């Protein structure tokens, strides 16, 4: 029970500042307080937006762009509420641009546009939904990649490091990959680096090259 309570407190802590709906279940005039249910409000919203109307159509369906509320944010995910259904959007679905930390771009209480990619309905209490943000924002990487020249030197920020491969977001709006670093210091996440392009990978829309030096370490 203690573990469950800790988990619930953690979830509530992460949701501080979130905008939520609730149905009032009771009022105590003496203590000037109300008892309310978020769960009931979410079920009501699900009935309105997900279940088919008299014409057999649903307001929230695959392919539709809708507004979602941001209710929690972590480094690699943004938790949203989409008309009574919660869904955590992974960083890879937030933007075509490589993102090191979602908390720098998204905040609890934000309202964002998402595209519904799938809806699964078994009953009003059992609805799951998937959505992304990047298809709404569009992809500028292809256009920006044309600004890159082989042997060109650009400044960027390290978004991630995985198995020796360094992922960089260049300031000119291009995703880049480096397999080697010529600075004596080890590169780290969020470091600002100078990147030299050795080739352009048009298929994957990335610049490939090396880190010539670390301009500013994220300490």
Predicted regions located by residue number:
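Single-stranded RNA-binding regions, centering on S1/OB-family and related RNA-binding modules
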Residues: 1-219
């Amino acid at each position: 029970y203690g573990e469950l309570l800790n988990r619930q407190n953690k979830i509530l802590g992460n949701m501080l500042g979130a905008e939520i709906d609730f149905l009032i279940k009771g009022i105590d005039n003496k203590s000037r307080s109300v008892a309310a249910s978020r769960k009931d409000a979410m079920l009501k919203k699900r009935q309105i937006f997900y279940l088919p109307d008299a014409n057999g159509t649903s307001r929230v369906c695959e392919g539709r762009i809708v507004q979602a509320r941001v209710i929690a944010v972590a480094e690699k995910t943004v938790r949203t509420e989409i008309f009574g259904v919660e869904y955590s959007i992974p960083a890879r679905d937030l933007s075509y641009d490589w993102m090191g930390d979602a908390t720098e771009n998204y905040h609890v209480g934000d309202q964002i546009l998402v595209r519904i990619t799938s809806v699964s309905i078994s009953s009003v209490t059992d609805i799951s939904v998937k959505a992304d943000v990047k298809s709404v924002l569009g992809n500028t990487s292809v256009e920006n990649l044309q600004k890159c020249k082989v042997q060109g030197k650009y400044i960027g920020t390290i978004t991630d490091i995985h198995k020796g491969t360094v992922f960089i977001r260049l300031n000119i709006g291009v995703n880049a990959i480096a397999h080697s670093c010529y600075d004596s210091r080890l590169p780290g996440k969020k470091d600002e680096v100078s990147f030299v392009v050795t080739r352009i990978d048009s298929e994957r829309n990335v610049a490939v090259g090396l880190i010539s030096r670390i301009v500013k370490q994220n300490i």
